[in-house]
Amino acid sequence: MILNITAYFIIPVYTFLFAWGTDLFRLNFSVLGSLANRKNAFLLWGIIVGIYVLRKIIHHLPRNRKETVTSVSALILLAFAVTTPYLPENRPFRAFLHVIFAFSASVLLLACLYLIVWKLYCMNREVYRPYFICLNIITVLSAMLLCLAGIVSSALEIFFTVSCTLMLIRLYRRVTSSRDGYYSLKHKV
């Protein structure tokens, strides 16, 4: 129940509200998070997304060492990104680090999702094909938004966050459903 509320309501609404009233194609969460009135909101957004995506969902999906290292690295980089201020005029090196942390966290999350979905797809192509296609669509549309704006924009960050969250809750429900043997085999005593 709490996973559904978080996935279908809290993360999408909070993500949209965080960027509300701003130019979605000229600004990004880094710029918004550096504003005094949005600093705590940015930190809270990072905590919600980090805990939900990387701990509650990916933790329960099939993974081996590669996926574990990738997801933990993404979580650490996300934590670094939301706690490293993006102030290019005052602190250019920290701003540079912030960009590296944020971008790397997203790339590692995407890589982790591909590793997990690919593993499931190889186990049962018919069942997990929609998730593999969905992940490819998320990747292509994210690349298109990046090219359209020329920067990692709020529009891209909103799309990526919400679409990955919604895909993950559906994948999580599929993997943990009784119709799929993976979860029951994994958690047998």
Report residues per predicted region.
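Membrane-interfacial loop-to-transmembrane alpha-helix junctions, especially the N-terminal start
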Residues: 1-7, 63-74, 124-135
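N-terminal topogenic module of multi-pass integral membrane proteins
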Residues: 1-61
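Hydrophobic cores of alpha-helical transmembrane segments in multi-pass inner/ER membrane proteins
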Residues: 8-14, 41-56, 105-116, 160-175
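Hydrophobic alpha-helical transmembrane segments and adjacent interfacial helices
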Residues: 12-16, 54-57, 75-89, 111-115, ...
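Non-cytosolic membrane-interface motifs at loop->transmembrane helix junctions
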Residues: 30-34, 91-105, 153-163
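Terminal transmembrane helical module of multi-pass membrane proteins
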Residues: 122-189
